[in-house]
A protein has these predicted regions:
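Polytopic transmembrane helical bundles with strong interfacial aromatic enrichment
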Residues: 1-145
Length: 145
């Protein structure tokens, strides 16, 4: 059963990179109605996939699922619960995933709280944010286990 959560973590992380790679393409769309729908789907999908990724990693740390290499290297069965939770971002992979989660939450709030008068500015801001987050996700995938 616990192997499923490690797979969920990896699948949603891959989904996040897929969405981030296509997000800038959505921003270049000429039709405003299509553009706003695609950006809405992208921003929500990114937030959900990042949240699921981070919390599934947190779950496998809490239940001490040692089939996940990150848990095997950075956890112990006798650790108190608080240390297991804080141990999620106490290593390279977890801290990078937390940073990606913070970036996607920031991206979501930019999208939700923007002023309609500056939609071009917000679109460019979201596009730039997507490029930055894509870089972090690629770095995490390529340098982490």
């Amino acid at each position: 059963m616990n192997l499923i959560y490690g797979a969920i973590f990896r699948r949603f992380f891959a989904l996040a990179i897929f969405i981030f790679c296509y997000f800038p393409i959505f921003c270049f769309s000429k039709k405003n109605e299509l553009k706003s729908k695609l950006i809405t789907i992208s921003v929500n999908g990114l937030l959900i996939s990042s949240l699921i990724s981070f919390f599934s990693l947190m779950y496998v740390h809490i239940v001490s699922d040692f089939s996940v290499l990150n848990v095997f290297q950075n956890s112990h069965t006798t650790k108190p619960l608080l240390y297991k939770i804080s141990g999620v971002w106490g290593n390279h992979e977890g801290s990078m995933l937390l940073w990606i989660l913070v970036l996607t939450i920031f991206n979501y709030f930019i999208f939700k709280l923007y002023n309609k008068k500056n939609s071009t500015f917000i679109s460019k801001t979201l596009e730039t944010q997507a490029f930055i987050t894509t870089g972090f996700i690629l770095f995490t995938i390529l340098t982490s286990n």
